[in-house]
Regions:
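N-terminal membrane-anchoring alpha-helices
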Residues: 1-57
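Short gly/ser/thr-rich secondary-structure transition/capping motifs
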Residues: 53-61, 129-130, 186-188
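Generic preference for hydrophobic
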Residues: 60, 74, 96, 204-206
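Thr-Gly-centered strand-to-loop micro-motif
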Residues: 61, 97-99, 120-122, 150, ...
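Glycine-rich helix-loop-beta junction characteristic of Rossmann-like nucleotide cofactor-binding loops
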Residues: 62-67
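Non-catalytic C-terminal accessory region of glycerolipid acyltransferases
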Residues: 130-249
Length: 249
């Protein structure tokens, strides 16, 4: 019952913030081509979502590694839809890359459109990569970062699986740094019966960026492997630390 009421509250909040985002887009567009205002409204909505349940906890590690003046290609491990709001805890203006089907989701799809996120058709690989690079470079040139799930789909077992080349190709083409981010705890926030886990803990760990010079120097497959190994190691460290804290209790 409590979960149902919270879902209803979220629908009302999303409706309100969708209207505010549409107004902000119209009013601010002439001097805010990077849609920073719309992004900040999304961050406020996310903070309300995570703040209201009193026993939810979110921890961000490595925030100091981010240079807010830079544009990054952000790569994140993917477990569930909750990964998307969780990333809004990092202090960057970014655009998501998402498959076409997600843009058709009620409320969520409209938010993606207002936010200016990048829509790709995974059924057409070459065209999807071309659009990713074209639109990604456009947003990076406007001062925004681009966030991508390099696995291309959700992990069923919570582990980080093989990466696809899109994010790394974009970073090379745009001359951008790669910012790896590891998420843990998002998979357990919503139970299989769609009820919320009211005692959930989420960790967002930011890893040191891969400099643009190294991005350019490495072959794409080498870059993918390096970032994959770093993210797997970091995820293991986050989970081991969580187990130690649990044992101490």
């Amino acid at each position: 019952m409590l979960s149902a009421l919270y879902y209803l509250l979220l629908v009302l909040l999303c409706t309100l913030f969708m209207i505010l985002s549409a107004l902000a887009l119209v009013v601010c567009y002439p001097f805010d081509r990077g849609r920073r205002t719309v992004h900040e409204l999304s961050r406020i909505l996310v903070r309300i979502f995570f703040f209201l349940p009193p026993f939810w906890r979110q921890r961000v590690i490595g925030r100091e590694l981010i240079d807010r003046k830079k544009s990054y290609v952000i790569v994140i491990n993917h477990n569930t839809v909750i990964d998307i709001p969780a990333l809004y805890y990092i202090p960057l203006n970014f655009r998501w890359v998402s498959k076409r089907e997600v843009f058709k989701t009620p409320f969520f799809g409209q938010f993606l459109l207002l936010h200016g996120d990048i829509c790709i058709d995974r059924g057409h690989g070459a065209e999807a990569l071309e659009q990713l690079v074209r639109d990604g470079k456009k947003w990076i040139s406007r001062g925004a970062s681009v966030a991508i799930f390099p696995e291309g789909t959700r992990s069923k077992d919570g582990e980080i699986h093989r990466f696809k080349a899109g994010a790394f190709t974009l970073a090379k083409e745009a001359g951008a740094e790669i910012l790896p981010v590891v998420l843990d705890g998002t998979k357990t926030l919503i139970k299989k019966n769609l009820a919320f886990n009211w005692g959930n803990r989420i960790t967002v760990r930011v890893l040191p960026p891969v400099p643009a010079e190294r991005v350019a120097a490495l072959e794409t497959h080498e870059l993918m492997q390096e970032v994959h190994e770093r993210m797997c190691t970091a995820l293991g460290e986050v989970r081991n630390e969580k187990l130690k804290v649990k044992d101490q209790k």
